[in-house]
Amino acid sequence: MNLYSYSRIIKFPGHNALVLKRLFHRPYQFKSVPDDIKNNLVTECECFVKRLNEKLPDKSQLDISLTLPNKVPEYHKHVLMLSKDPKGWKNWPSKLEMAHEYPHSMVGTLKSSLKDTRDGSGVLVNELALDGYTSSETHLKFLVIPDMKVYEVHRDRVSDFALFLGDGKQDSRKKLSFNDFLKGSDAVGQTAIHSSGSVANSIPNFQSEPFHSDIAMVCGHYLRDARCGELAPLLIAKLNSIKPNLKTGIVSHFGGHKFAGNLIYYQFNGLKIHNDNETGKIDGLWLSKLLPQNLEFVFRHLDKDIILQDFYRGHMSTAAYT
C-alpha cells in the first residue's frame, strides 16, 4: 500500500481532478508476514489461546481464526476520561454510557452533550486507566488526541467541556418548508438570511498540561468482554518489557471487534498549527489479533516503519489534514 491515497473530486462541471491525500506522517510500508514465520507464530499462539480459553466461559472463547475487520470508525478526535483508580478497570460497568456511578457516568454525560455541538459527531469517547494520570472526586482529567493535552474539568462542567471539544453549540437554523418555496426565490433567500445565523456562543477554555508522548492503549473492558479483560494485562506487561519508555494503558471497549488483543497505538510526531490551534502530528494505528507471542514481532516492525497487514485494522492520522 502506498503512503498516499487518491481521491477524485469535481472542481468544475465536467472536469475531474485527482488529489493526493497523505495517509501517515511516518514513511510506513505495508507488508505481510512470510508464511514460514506466520506458521510458527500461529503454533505458539494456539498453545497460548488453548490455556487462556480454559479460564474463559464457553460464550467468550478466543478464536484466532476469525477474519480481521479492516475497518475503524471515522473520527478526528479521541477523548479519554482518565480513571480515578488505574487498577480498577476490571470493575468498569459493561456500558459506560449508561453507568450511574461517578466517574463512569460522566462518559454518558459527555457523549450526550457532544450531540448538541457543531463538531461532536467525529469524537470518540472512552475511559482510560493510565498510571500517573488520575481523576479525582471533584475534577476529571481527559487526555485528548490529537490535541496531545490532558485537560482538567470540574465534574459539574462536563457539558461545557463538550462545547469546547465540539467547537461550540450546534447552529440553530430554521428549516425551509414547502410553503417557503411556494413564495418564490426571494422569500426563500430572505428566510435563509434571517435564520442562518446562530446565537453567538462563547466557547469555554480549560486548563491543560502537555502530553507529548507515544501511547499504546489496549482494550481491557472486562465486564464488556472477558477475553479482553484477561488478555489486556498480559499485553501491557509484554509492552512494558519490550518498550519500557512507551506509555501504556487499558482502555474501555472502542468498538467493532470480536477478537481480543485490540490495541490503538498513537505516535506523536511533533506539533503543527491546524485551524489556528496547536495540535499533534499523530499517526494512530488500530491493531488486532495481538498476543504476548506476536506482540514483539509486530512492534519490532513498527519501529522500522513497517505495518504488518495481518494485524492491521485501520488508522487515524492528522496527516490527512495537511
From Swiss-Prot:
InterPro entries: Aim32/Apd1-like. PANTHER family: ACTIN PATCHES DISTAL PROTEIN 1 (PTHR31902), ALTERED INHERITANCE OF MITOCHONDRIA PROTEIN 32 (PTHR31902:SF7). Belongs to the AIM32 family. This is Altered inheritance of mitochondria protein 32. The gene is AIM32.
